[in-house]
Amino acid sequence: MESPVELLAALPALVTALALLLAWLLLRRGAARVPAPESTASDEAPGAPAPPEPPESCAPEPAPEGPSQSERVAEPEESEAEEPAAEGRQDEDSDSEMGPPTEEPEEEDGAAFSFKYSPGQLRGSQYKKMMTKEELEEEHRVQKEQLAAIFKLMKDNKDTFGEMSDGDMQEQLRLYDM
C-alpha cells in the first residue's frame, strides 16, 4: 500500500530531475556546436567529447547565428559550475539571453524593418510608426469600412443590439479616432 503512495510523492521530484537532465543535455549539445570551428584554439578535456558531435550538428549551425553567440557566453559558465541545478539555472539564463537579441534588432531597425502590409490587420499604436502616409490612409479607410459594416449590421438587427442613435455612432467614431 505504501509503495504506490511513495511513488506518487516522488513523481514530481523525478520529473524535475528529468527536466534538469534534459536541459543540461541540450545546453551541453548546444555548447558542443560552438567549439567545432574553434577546435584548434581549445584543447581542454571538456572539449574532447565535442569533436564526435559536430558532424551531426554541422548543417544546422550556420542558420542560428544569434543563439550560438549566446551559447558561447553560456559555455564558460558551464565549465565553472558542475551541479545540474546550477546548469539548469544557466539554461534559463541562456534562454533569456537568446530571446532579447533576436527581438532587439527588429526594434532597433524600426525604420529599416520591412513587413508585408495588409490593410485592417494591424493593431495597437505602433503601426503609425511603421507605416508610410499612404499605408496609414489605407488603414484608416479600411477601419472606416469595417465600422460602417458594423454599424449597418447593428441597425439591421435592432432587436438584437437595441437602438443606436447618431450620438452613439459619433461617440463610437470618437473612440476609434475617426
From Swiss-Prot:
User: Where's it found, cell-wise?
Assistant: Membrane
Q: Where is this chain primarily localised?
A: membrane
**Which intervals carry biased composition (Pro residues)?**
48-65
Name the membrane topology term: Single-pass membrane protein
Spell out the GO cellular component terms annotated for this protein, sorted alphabetically and separated by semicolons.
membrane
Query: Segment Disordered: which positions?
Result: 33-121
Keywords on this record? Membrane, Phosphoprotein, Transmembrane, Transmembrane helix
Nucleotidyltransferase found in the keyword field: no
Q: What is this protein called?
A: Matrix-remodeling-associated protein 7
Record gene name: Mxra7
